[in-house]
Protein backbone atom coordinates (compact mmCIF):
# COMPACT_ATOMS: atom_id res chain seq x y z
CA UNK A 1 0.00 0.00 0.00
CA UNK A 2 1.38 3.45 -0.85
CA UNK A 3 2.23 5.22 2.40
CA UNK A 4 3.11 8.84 3.11
CA UNK A 5 6.44 8.85 1.21
CA UNK A 6 4.89 7.32 -1.91
CA UNK A 7 1.97 9.76 -1.80
CA UNK A 8 4.32 12.70 -1.29
CA UNK A 9 6.51 11.53 -4.18
CA UNK A 10 3.35 11.39 -6.31
CA UNK A 11 2.28 14.87 -5.19
CA UNK A 12 5.67 16.38 -6.00
CA UNK A 13 5.66 14.75 -9.41
CA UNK A 14 2.15 15.90 -10.27
CA UNK A 15 2.03 19.43 -8.84
CA UNK A 16 4.24 21.14 -11.47
CA UNK A 17 2.00 19.81 -14.25
CA UNK A 18 -1.34 20.42 -12.53
CA UNK A 19 -1.16 23.62 -10.49
CA UNK A 20 -2.32 26.60 -12.52
CA UNK A 21 -3.78 24.44 -15.33
CA UNK A 22 -7.44 23.99 -16.26
CA UNK A 23 -9.16 20.63 -16.45
CA UNK A 24 -10.62 20.37 -19.95
CA UNK A 25 -12.65 17.26 -19.18
CA UNK A 26 -12.78 14.18 -16.96
CA UNK A 27 -13.30 10.66 -18.29
CA UNK A 28 -14.66 8.29 -15.64
CA UNK A 29 -14.57 4.70 -16.89
CA UNK A 30 -15.19 2.98 -13.55
CA UNK A 31 -17.92 4.39 -11.34
CA UNK A 32 -17.21 2.19 -8.31
CA UNK A 33 -13.86 2.17 -6.55
CA UNK A 34 -13.67 1.79 -2.77
CA UNK A 35 -16.63 4.15 -2.74
CA UNK A 36 -18.72 5.38 -5.68
CA UNK A 37 -17.05 8.05 -7.80
CA UNK A 38 -19.28 11.15 -7.59
CA UNK A 39 -21.66 11.12 -10.54
CA UNK A 40 -21.12 14.85 -11.12
CA UNK A 41 -17.31 14.79 -10.83
CA UNK A 42 -16.76 15.55 -14.52
CA UNK A 43 -19.30 18.38 -14.43
CA UNK A 44 -17.83 19.89 -11.26
CA UNK A 45 -14.28 19.94 -12.64
CA UNK A 46 -14.81 20.89 -16.28
CA UNK A 47 -12.91 24.11 -17.09
CA UNK A 48 -11.81 24.49 -13.46
CA UNK A 49 -8.29 25.65 -12.71
CA UNK A 50 -6.36 23.56 -10.21
CA UNK A 51 -5.19 26.04 -7.60
CA UNK A 52 -3.02 23.75 -5.47
CA UNK A 53 -2.13 20.13 -4.80
CA UNK A 54 -1.68 19.25 -1.14
CA UNK A 55 -1.30 16.07 0.87
CA UNK A 56 -2.95 15.16 4.17
CA UNK A 57 -1.71 11.82 5.43
CA UNK A 58 -2.15 9.46 2.49
CA UNK A 59 -4.79 11.63 0.78
CA UNK A 60 -4.07 13.95 -2.15
CA UNK A 61 -6.14 17.15 -2.14
CA UNK A 62 -6.61 18.94 -5.47
CA UNK A 63 -8.09 22.39 -4.88
CA UNK A 64 -10.25 24.20 -7.44
CA UNK A 65 -12.39 27.28 -6.88
CA UNK A 66 -15.53 25.20 -6.26
CA UNK A 67 -13.94 22.77 -3.80
CA UNK A 68 -11.51 19.88 -3.69
CA UNK A 69 -11.30 16.50 -5.33
CA UNK A 70 -9.68 14.00 -3.02
CA UNK A 71 -7.66 11.00 -4.20
CA UNK A 72 -6.57 8.00 -2.12
CA UNK A 73 -4.34 5.45 -3.84
CA UNK A 74 -5.62 2.49 -1.82
CA UNK A 75 -3.54 -0.69 -2.07
CA UNK A 76 -2.40 -0.54 -5.69
CA UNK A 77 -3.32 2.88 -7.06
CA UNK A 78 -1.02 5.16 -9.05
CA UNK A 79 -1.37 8.56 -10.71
CA UNK A 80 0.62 9.02 -13.92
CA UNK A 81 1.27 12.15 -15.97
CA UNK A 82 1.07 11.26 -19.67
CA UNK A 83 1.48 13.57 -22.69
CA UNK A 84 -1.74 14.10 -24.64
CA UNK A 85 0.13 13.43 -27.86
CA UNK A 86 0.39 9.66 -28.08
CA UNK A 87 -1.31 8.89 -24.76
CA UNK A 88 -1.81 5.10 -24.51
CA UNK A 89 -5.31 3.72 -24.92
CA UNK A 90 -6.80 3.21 -21.46
CA UNK A 91 -6.28 -0.34 -20.20
CA UNK A 92 -8.52 -2.45 -17.97
CA UNK A 93 -7.41 -0.90 -14.69
CA UNK A 94 -7.15 2.71 -15.91
CA UNK A 95 -10.27 4.09 -14.24
CA UNK A 96 -10.18 7.90 -14.48
CA UNK A 97 -8.46 10.46 -16.71
CA UNK A 98 -8.23 14.17 -15.99
CA UNK A 99 -7.46 15.75 -19.35
CA UNK A 100 -5.51 19.03 -19.45
CA UNK A 101 -4.30 20.92 -22.51
CA UNK A 102 -0.97 19.11 -22.90
CA UNK A 103 -1.19 16.05 -20.69
CA UNK A 104 -3.46 13.50 -19.05
CA UNK A 105 -3.48 12.66 -15.34
CA UNK A 106 -4.42 8.97 -15.23
CA UNK A 107 -5.59 7.02 -12.17
CA UNK A 108 -4.84 3.31 -12.33
CA UNK A 109 -5.85 0.88 -9.59
CA UNK A 110 -5.92 -2.88 -10.26
CA UNK A 111 -7.54 -3.78 -6.93
CA UNK A 112 -9.92 -0.80 -6.83
CA UNK A 113 -9.38 -0.05 -3.13
CA UNK A 114 -8.51 3.54 -4.00
CA UNK A 115 -10.97 6.43 -3.94
CA UNK A 116 -11.81 9.64 -5.77
CA UNK A 117 -14.16 11.95 -3.88
CA UNK A 118 -15.53 15.49 -4.19
CA UNK A 119 -15.74 18.01 -1.33
CA UNK A 120 -17.63 21.18 -2.32
CA UNK A 121 -16.41 24.46 -0.85
CA UNK A 122 -19.80 25.18 0.68
CA UNK A 123 -19.31 22.10 2.88
CA UNK A 124 -16.44 23.88 4.65
CA UNK A 125 -12.71 23.36 4.79
CA UNK A 126 -11.55 20.09 3.28
CA UNK A 127 -9.58 19.21 6.42
CA UNK A 128 -12.90 18.86 8.23
CA UNK A 129 -13.94 16.06 5.84
CA UNK A 130 -14.85 12.92 7.85
CA UNK A 131 -11.92 10.99 6.35
CA UNK A 132 -9.43 13.69 7.34
CA UNK A 133 -10.71 15.21 10.57
CA UNK A 134 -9.55 12.41 12.89
CA UNK A 135 -6.09 11.92 11.39
CA UNK A 136 -3.00 12.34 13.56
CA UNK A 137 -0.45 15.10 13.11
CA UNK A 138 1.82 15.34 10.09
CA UNK A 139 5.28 13.92 10.83
CA UNK A 140 7.05 16.96 9.35
CA UNK A 141 4.95 19.48 11.29
CA UNK A 142 6.22 21.21 14.46
CA UNK A 143 3.37 19.50 16.36
CA UNK A 144 4.99 16.08 15.95
CA UNK A 145 7.31 15.66 18.92
CA UNK A 146 8.49 13.02 21.34
CA UNK A 147 6.46 14.79 24.01
CA UNK A 148 3.30 14.27 21.95
CA UNK A 149 3.99 10.55 21.53
CA UNK A 150 4.80 10.21 25.22
CA UNK A 151 1.65 12.01 26.35
CA UNK A 152 -0.65 10.13 23.99
CA UNK A 153 0.61 6.67 25.02
CA UNK A 154 0.47 6.89 28.80
CA UNK A 155 -1.29 3.82 30.17
CA UNK A 156 -1.49 2.09 26.78
CA UNK A 157 -0.51 -1.58 26.65
CA UNK A 158 -0.55 -1.90 22.87
CA UNK A 159 2.91 -2.31 21.33
CA UNK A 160 4.78 0.80 20.28
CA UNK A 161 4.81 -0.38 16.68
CA UNK A 162 1.04 -0.86 16.58
CA UNK A 163 0.59 2.56 18.18
CA UNK A 164 2.60 4.09 15.33
CA UNK A 165 0.58 2.26 12.70
CA UNK A 166 -2.80 3.33 14.12
CA UNK A 167 -2.57 6.79 12.54
CA UNK A 168 -4.31 8.66 15.35
CA UNK A 169 -1.04 10.09 16.75
CA UNK A 170 0.94 10.56 13.56
CA UNK A 171 -0.06 9.87 9.96
CA UNK A 172 1.69 7.98 7.21
CA UNK A 173 3.97 5.66 9.19
CA UNK A 174 3.17 2.38 7.44
CA UNK A 175 4.59 -1.04 8.18
CA UNK A 176 7.94 -0.69 6.44
CA UNK A 177 8.56 2.78 7.89
CA UNK A 178 7.51 1.78 11.42
CA UNK A 179 10.03 -1.08 11.41
CA UNK A 180 12.79 1.16 10.07
CA UNK A 181 12.02 4.04 12.44
CA UNK A 182 12.05 1.76 15.48
CA UNK A 183 15.37 0.31 14.36
CA UNK A 184 16.91 3.77 14.03
CA UNK A 185 15.58 4.71 17.47
CA UNK A 186 16.83 1.47 19.06
CA UNK A 187 13.38 0.53 20.36
CA UNK A 188 12.10 -3.03 20.24
CA UNK A 189 8.74 -3.05 18.40
CA UNK A 190 7.05 -5.30 20.99
CA UNK A 191 7.61 -2.83 23.84
CA UNK A 192 4.35 -1.57 25.35
CA UNK A 193 3.75 1.97 24.11
CA UNK A 194 3.00 3.16 27.62
CA UNK A 195 6.39 1.99 28.90
CA UNK A 196 8.55 3.93 26.44
CA UNK A 197 10.25 6.87 28.16
CA UNK A 198 10.16 10.48 26.98
CA UNK A 199 13.83 10.51 25.85
CA UNK A 200 13.24 7.37 23.79
CA UNK A 201 10.12 8.88 22.22
CA UNK A 202 12.16 11.96 21.34
CA UNK A 203 14.61 9.70 19.52
CA UNK A 204 11.70 7.93 17.84
CA UNK A 205 10.15 11.18 16.59
CA UNK A 206 13.51 12.14 15.07
CA UNK A 207 13.84 8.66 13.55
CA UNK A 208 10.37 8.80 11.99
CA UNK A 209 11.13 12.14 10.33
CA UNK A 210 14.53 10.96 9.10
CA UNK A 211 13.17 7.66 7.79
CA UNK A 212 10.31 9.28 5.90
CA UNK A 213 12.58 12.00 4.50
CA UNK A 214 15.02 9.36 3.25
CA UNK A 215 12.18 7.40 1.67
CA UNK A 216 10.87 10.48 -0.15
CA UNK A 217 14.38 11.27 -1.40
CA UNK A 218 14.65 7.73 -2.79
CA UNK A 219 11.29 7.87 -4.55
CA UNK A 220 9.42 5.82 -1.94
CA UNK A 221 9.32 2.04 -1.71
CA UNK A 222 8.17 -0.27 -4.50
CA UNK A 223 7.17 -3.55 -2.86
CA UNK A 224 4.66 -4.55 -5.53
CA UNK A 225 2.84 -2.02 -7.69
CA UNK A 226 3.92 1.49 -6.76
CA UNK A 227 5.45 3.79 -9.35
CA UNK A 228 5.74 7.55 -9.24
CA UNK A 229 3.96 9.97 -11.54
CA UNK A 230 6.72 9.44 -14.12
CA UNK A 231 6.39 5.64 -14.02
CA UNK A 232 9.62 5.06 -12.09
CA UNK A 233 9.84 2.69 -9.11
CA UNK A 234 11.03 3.75 -5.67
CA UNK A 235 14.11 2.16 -4.18
CA UNK A 236 14.09 2.91 -0.43
CA UNK A 237 13.42 -0.77 0.29
CA UNK A 238 16.82 -1.72 -1.13
CA UNK A 239 18.66 -0.08 1.77
CA UNK A 240 16.50 -1.06 4.74
CA UNK A 241 18.17 -1.88 8.05
CA UNK A 242 15.46 -4.26 9.26
CA UNK A 243 12.43 -4.57 6.98
CA UNK A 244 12.30 -7.78 4.93
CA UNK A 245 15.77 -8.85 6.12
CA UNK A 246 14.78 -11.84 8.29
CA UNK A 247 17.81 -14.04 8.98
CA UNK A 248 20.27 -11.63 7.40
CA UNK A 249 22.97 -10.03 9.55
CA UNK A 250 22.17 -6.66 11.07
CA UNK A 251 23.95 -3.95 9.10
CA UNK A 252 25.15 -2.45 12.42
CA UNK A 253 26.06 -5.37 14.71
CA UNK A 254 25.82 -8.53 12.61
CA UNK A 255 23.11 -10.22 14.70
CA UNK A 256 20.52 -12.00 12.50
CA UNK A 257 17.39 -9.91 11.98
CA UNK A 258 14.27 -11.48 13.46
CA UNK A 259 10.78 -11.58 11.98
CA UNK A 260 7.59 -11.78 14.03
CA UNK A 261 3.91 -11.09 13.35
CA UNK A 262 2.10 -8.21 15.04
CA UNK A 263 -1.50 -7.48 14.19
CA UNK A 264 -1.31 -9.75 11.12
CA UNK A 265 1.68 -7.79 9.77
CA UNK A 266 5.32 -8.81 9.62
CA UNK A 267 7.69 -6.98 11.93
CA UNK A 268 11.47 -7.03 11.60
CA UNK A 269 13.97 -6.04 14.28
CA UNK A 270 17.48 -6.60 15.60
CA UNK A 271 17.41 -8.25 19.05
CA UNK A 272 20.76 -6.65 19.91
CA UNK A 273 20.36 -3.08 18.65
CA UNK A 274 16.72 -2.72 19.72
CA UNK A 275 15.86 -2.93 23.40
UniProtKB/Swiss-Prot annotation:
Keywords: DNA damage, DNA repair, DNA-binding, Glycosidase, Hydrolase, Lyase, Metal-binding, Multifunctional enzyme, Zinc, Zinc-finger
Presence of keyword Protease: no
Free-text cofactor note: Binds 1 zinc ion per subunit.
Enzyme Commission no: 3.2.2.23, 4.2.99.18
Gene Ontology terms for molecular function: 8-oxo-7,8-dihydroguanine DNA N-glycosylase activity; class I DNA-(apurinic or apyrimidinic site) endonuclease activity; damaged DNA binding; zinc ion binding
Catalytic residues (positions): 2 (schiff-base intermediate with dna), 3 (proton donor), 58 (proton donor), 265 (proton donor)
InterPro entries noted in UniProt: DNA_glyclase/AP_lyase_DNA-bd, DNA_glyclase_Znf_dom_DNA_BS, Formamido-pyr_DNA_Glyclase, FPG_cat, MutM-like_N-ter, Ribosomal_uS13-like_H2TH, Znf_DNA_glyclase/AP_lyase, Znf_FPG/IleRS
Annotated zinc fingers (FPG-type), start-end: 241-275
Function statement: Involved in base excision repair of DNA damaged by oxidation or by mutagenic agents. Acts as a DNA glycosylase that recognizes and removes damaged bases. Has a preference for oxidized purines, such as 7,8-dihydro-8-oxoguanine (8-oxoG). Has AP (apurinic/apyrimidinic) lyase activity and introduces nicks in the DNA strand. Cleaves the DNA backbone by beta-delta elimination to generate a single-strand break at the site of the removed base with both 3'- and 5'-phosphates.
Protein name stated in the entry: Formamidopyrimidine-DNA glycosylase
Organism: Burkholderia vietnamiensis (strain G4 / LMG 22486) (Burkholderia cepacia (strain R1808))
Amino acid sequence: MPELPEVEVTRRGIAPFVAGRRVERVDVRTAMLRWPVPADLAEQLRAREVLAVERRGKYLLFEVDAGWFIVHLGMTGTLRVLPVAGVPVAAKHDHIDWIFDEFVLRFRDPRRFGAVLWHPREAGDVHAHPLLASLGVEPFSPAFTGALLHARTRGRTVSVKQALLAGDMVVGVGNIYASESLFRAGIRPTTAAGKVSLPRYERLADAVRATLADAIERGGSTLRDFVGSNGESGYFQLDCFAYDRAGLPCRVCGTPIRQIVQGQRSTYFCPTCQR
